[in-house]
Amino acid sequence: MTSANDKSTDTNVDSTQAEQKMAEKQNKLLSGIIERATKSGIGRKKLNPSAVESAVAKNMAEIHNNPTKLRLVVLGGGSFGTAMANLAARNGCDTTLWVRNKRTVKAMAKSQMNKKYLPGYKLDDRLKYSHELQAAVKDTDIIFIAVPGLAFRETLKSIAPFISGQSIVSLTKGMEKDTFALMSDIIKEELPEVNFGVMSGPNLAIEIMKNMPSATVIASESEPLRHAVQAALHSAFFRVFASDDIRGVELGGALKNIYAIAMGMAAAYEVGENTKAMILTRGLAEMSRFGVHAGANPLTFLGLSGVGDLYATCSSELSRNYRIGNMLGRGMTIDAAVKKLGQTAEGVNTIQQVHEKATKEGIYMPITHALHAVIYEDKAALGVALHLMEAGFRSDVEFVMEHDHSNASLTAQMQTANNQAKNEKTKPDNK
């Protein structure tokens, strides 16, 4: 005879087992979606957009048949690359961090720490490490590239023989020296068949490692890739937003470094809040002006990858470009400042590239030109700043609808509505 307690126990066991099975089913479904989302059927063979869409649809339809968790590799063991690899591993992704130096890999695996760039921050136990490029890249779904801009093209060439359907996401901010190419341009040149995206935002690596709430933007023309990156990195402390404006998101991440250097220099002179606000907002104006000229959506610069990244980089002493600017403001040469920093500050190269491009194309970039004069032409910073303040009159806000056009449009709409109302009144009564 079965007691009431026995029946209650059996019911609880059955309920627990059912919940476990449901959770397993949901996990399998999600992991399958993630993998299929990153597989758009693009290998070394060049496909047209409709074929890619068909491949994505086919893969999504097969999500129940071959579920597996997302497999990632992050190329580059700097602070941000390490932080992203750690975040993905913590989210349960099969994640490998590739670092070129074998000795560094052994040290990181042993200590579970990146002592050079993130000392004192323990990395997730599940994170794997490798110095062998082929082994790290093979059989992955997404390749995140977090190497300095100077090494970006060479890295793509190195992994080209091992690409067999993986998607690529650039974490590198800046422009290639001498070519003015953004990282997305380099991807299209070196691996034209690959599905790709770029990620950028106000992402100071140390704050991410401290679990301070942060957010970023993944930009790609591939919606499945955007969703996959969100699934891989999104957490209670790190939110991933999506965009399809690759140009705007990438330019925001590259151009803001210029104004971080300017803000660092200003801080060295102990300027007031008015001056800081002026540099920040006029820097944003330059970013959006340059971005629109390059084909970006000006509204993108009002988001995380624009004003968000600009604010974080310009207001934090953790920013490498801010620190470079601060050292320059205290009288150090650019070479000495870069050497003391010990890390790559992409803004130094970006200033030169944007100055040349803006001069050639006639884009109004006064702060950029002023920084170029100080860093590369050995001009006195205070003299250049005074010249900036004495520049001619300009409008404040750009990229808004002209008032005449706006009023004319509104007047036309009101007139149309008025005419329709009159017509309704003059219609004969059919009652």
UniProtKB/Swiss-Prot annotation:
UniProt keyword Lipid biosynthesis present: yes
Gene Ontology BP annotations: carbohydrate metabolic process; glycerol-3-phosphate biosynthetic process; glycerol-3-phosphate catabolic process; glycerophospholipid biosynthetic process
Entry superkingdom: Bacteria
Keyword annotations from UniProtKB, A to Z: Cytoplasm, Lipid biosynthesis, Lipid metabolism, NAD, NADP, Nucleotide-binding, Oxidoreductase, Phospholipid biosynthesis, Phospholipid metabolism
Entry EC number(s): 1.1.1.94
Pfam family, one: NAD_Gly3P_dh_N
CC annotations in GO: cytosol
Protein name as catalogued: Glycerol-3-phosphate dehydrogenase [NAD(P)+]
Organism whose genome encodes this protein: Psychrobacter arcticus (strain DSM 17307 / VKM B-2377 / 273-4)
GO molecular function, one term: glycerol-3-phosphate dehydrogenase [NAD(P)+] activity
Localization in the cell: Cytoplasm
Family note: Belongs to the NAD-dependent glycerol-3-phosphate dehydrogenase family.
Gene3D superfamilies on file: N-(1-d-carboxylethyl)-l-norvaline Dehydrogenase, domain 2, NAD(P)-binding Rossmann-like Domain
Binding residue positions for sn-glycerol 3-phosphate: 173, 201, 256, 309, 319-321
Pathway: Membrane lipid metabolism; glycerophospholipid metabolism
Binding locations of NADPH: 79-80, 100, 173, 205, 320, 346
Alphabetical list of SUPFAM superfamilies matching this protein: 6-phosphogluconate dehydrogenase C-terminal domain-like, NAD(P)-binding Rossmann-fold domains
Catalytic reaction list: sn-glycerol 3-phosphate + NAD(+) = dihydroxyacetone phosphate + NADH + H(+); sn-glycerol 3-phosphate + NADP(+) = dihydroxyacetone phosphate + NADPH + H(+)
Biological function: Catalyzes the reduction of the glycolytic intermediate dihydroxyacetone phosphate (DHAP) to sn-glycerol 3-phosphate (G3P), the key precursor for phospholipid synthesis.
NCBIfam families: PRK00094.1-2 (NF000940), PRK00094.1-4 (NF000942), PRK00094.2-2 (NF000944)
Active site residues per record: 256 (proton acceptor)
Comp. bias (Polar residues): 1-19
Chain segments carrying region Disordered: 1-25
Principal subcellular localisation of the protein: cytoplasm
